[in-house]
């Protein structure tokens, strides 16, 4: 069957065949480096394992960044009609493959602008790949991240995140006299409920995207049924809308923690920020957004849908670090992420390649117009 596939589908099929859970991206990185070379992109693999292909050109510099890693768990790779199934068939090998194919075609046509295509490592982990790009001061005037937005949609916003570990320690005693002791589980949960009440005037509480949301994700505490717990550790994930900066939230959390400690002097409670990310929203009227939206209409015959998602993506990090127009785009239904039913519609995948090609050409045209004003 594969001998009948076009080169773009063959590339994606092989990428899905190459099992690449986080930490095991070296084989697919070497494969993609060779593919990039064959398409006229100068490839290299950096010190953390990112594969980077470049096409020289003048300003503007455009970054296309996808990720090679997937969540763990092998799935059978199979074709069923116009669908390709397998681990990474949604999250997010089609987006990366589309970027490579689009960049290769543009390079062959002597695209005047500089293009950098990155297959990053560790996106599903701690984000080492993207962090290394930033530490090495990668330059871009526009950036597109490859994640499944849907072929006719462009993600322009993600919420920020703040992941906390709350540790509570108290003196223990016999559970037959609980009134004599502070229960570490109760105390930790009391503080957690106070955190859940933190809100800001800038929020739109009726909106899941424009409000602060919180989830208790883990709780560990207690030792024996006859002992009042003296230790409790809980983990929580809070998501922040663009109107609420991480700094603003942490300041309010600090006030809440200070007030709790003043009223609970015999309870030892510590809060650690395990991971955090600022919210990010792109300008819907930016050259990048307009260029890609134009291409969606041109290829699909429908206006692009601009999405705001309650999750958090790599574009948060780059957009808030480099302060350049940044969006997320890629084929696929994100509801299939990390499931056993990951699959991609190959017609949508092929259309996404054309959308990226036409979109980047439009971005260059709009950029040049803006420079003449």
Residue ranges and their predicted role:
Residues 1-63, 71, 231-235, 249-252, ...:
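N-terminal helical capping/dimerization or prosegment-like subdomains
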Residues 3, 44, 149, 156, ...:
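Metal-dependent amide/peptide-bond hydrolase catalytic core
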Residues 32, 96-106, 133, 188-191, ...:
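Buried hydrophobic packing segments
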Residues 43, 53, 77-79, 216-219:
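A structural signal for short hydrophobic beta-strand segments in well-ordered beta-sheet cores
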Residues 61-63, 84, 141-145, 163-165, ...:
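Short glycine-aspartate micro-motif
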Residues 97-163, 368:
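Acidic/histidine-rich catalytic neighborhood of metal-dependent amide-processing enzymes
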């Amino acid at each position: 069957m594969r001998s009948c596939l076009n080169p773009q589908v063959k590339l994606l099929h092989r990428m899905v065949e190459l099992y690449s859970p986080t930490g095991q991206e070296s084989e697919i990185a070497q494969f993609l480096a060779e593919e990039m070379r064959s398409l006229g992109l100068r490839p290299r693999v950096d010190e953390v394992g990112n594969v980077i292909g470049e096409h020289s050109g003048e300003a503007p510099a455009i970054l296309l960044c996808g990720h090679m890693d997937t969540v763990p768990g092998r799935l059978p790779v199979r074709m069923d009609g116009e669908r390709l199934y397998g681990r990474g068939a949604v999250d997010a090998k089609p987006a990366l493959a589309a970027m490579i194919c689009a960049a290769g075609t543009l390079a062959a046509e002597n695209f005047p602008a500089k293009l950098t295509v990155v297959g990053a490592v560790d996106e599903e982990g701690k984000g080492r790949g993207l962090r290394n790009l930033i530490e090495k001061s990668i330059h871009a005037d526009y950036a597109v991240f490859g994640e499944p937005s849907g072929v006719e949609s462009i993600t322009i916003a993600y919420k920020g995140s703040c992941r906390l570990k709350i540790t509570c320690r108290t003196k223990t005693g016999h559970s037959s006299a609980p009134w004599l002791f502070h229960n570490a589980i109760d105390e930790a949960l009391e503080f957690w409920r106070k955190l859940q009440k933190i809100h800001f005037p800038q929020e739109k509480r009726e909106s899941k995207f424009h409000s602060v949301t919180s989830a208790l994700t883990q709780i560990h505490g207690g030792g024996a049924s006859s002992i009042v717990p003296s230790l409790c550790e809980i983990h929580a994930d809070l998501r922040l809308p663009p109107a609420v900066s991480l700094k603003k939230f942490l300041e309010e959390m600090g006030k809440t923690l200070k007030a709790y400690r003043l009223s609970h002097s015999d309870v030892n409670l510590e809060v650690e920020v395990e991971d955090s990310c600022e919210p990010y929203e792109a300008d819907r009227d930016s050259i990048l957004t307009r260029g890609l939206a134009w291409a969606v209409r041109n290829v699909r015959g429908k206006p692009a849908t601009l999405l705001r998602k309650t999750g958090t993506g790599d574009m948060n990090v780059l957009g808030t670090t480099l302060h350049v127009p940044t969006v997320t785009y890629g084929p696929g239904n994100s509801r299939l992420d990390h499931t056993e039913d990951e699959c991609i519609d190959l017609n949508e995948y092929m259309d996404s390649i054309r959308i990226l090609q036409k979109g980047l050409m439009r971005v260059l045209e709009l950029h040049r117009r803006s420079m003449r004003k």
